[in-house]
Curated annotation (Swiss-Prot):
Entry EC number(s): 4.1.1.-
Record keyword Phosphoprotein present: no
GN (gene name): dmxR15
Protein's pathway: Secondary metabolite biosynthesis
Protein's organism: Cryptosporiopsis sp. (strain 8999)
Cystine connections: none
Name of this chain's protein: Decarboxylase dmxR15
Catalyzed reaction equations: atrochrysone carboxylate + H(+) = atrochrysone + CO2
Length: 146
């Protein structure tokens, strides 16, 4: 696998006009915490505490996808020869923003440092959780499907 230097990474080979970066956190819950307690903390404690700060720093969208045992079991109905490996993450959290500097500034905010850094240790296994970032490609036309 080739390694990109910083200038290559910051200058993709396509236009990023009107595109969002998406930080995806593939999260594991803290050892010993139940699925229900993990989801409850993220939805009812962390989200309300985080939302206004994200808006302040230009975050355009934030989603949480909780992969509890009951929904993970549904995957057995979708497996086929090409798609048969089940991800064991407890949650995917996705944060959409236009500029990585905005997100970096949010992490430097004193309120973030005082409240949110500690909160992650309450519910997340921060040593096992993983992250990635990429440009979002949207395919419209699904608005009237439901």
């Amino acid at each position: 696998m080739s390694v990109l230097n910083e200038s290559e990474a910051l200058a993709p080979s396509f236009s990023t006009k009107d595109k969002y970066l998406c930080l995806t956190i593939c999260g594991y819950r803290k050892p010993g915490m139940s699925e229900g307690d993990y989801r409850n903390h993220m939805v009812n404690v962390s989200a309300p505490m985080t939302k206004d700060l994200m808006v302040k720093y230009g975050v355009k969208r934030w989603t949480q996808i909780h992969n509890q045992s009951a929904t993970r079991a549904l995957m057995s109905q979708l497996f086929d020869p090409q798609m048969c490996n089940l991800a064991d993450f407890d949650c995917f959290s996705q944060v959409f923003f236009r500029n990585i500097d905005d997100y970096k500034r949010m992490k430097l905010d004193p309120w973030y440092k005082k409240h949110l850094m500690h909160d992650h240790e309450v519910f997340a296994d921060t040593k096992r959780s993983m992250m990635t970032i990429g440009w979002v490609e949207e395919f419209n036309g699904f608005e009237n499907v439901l």
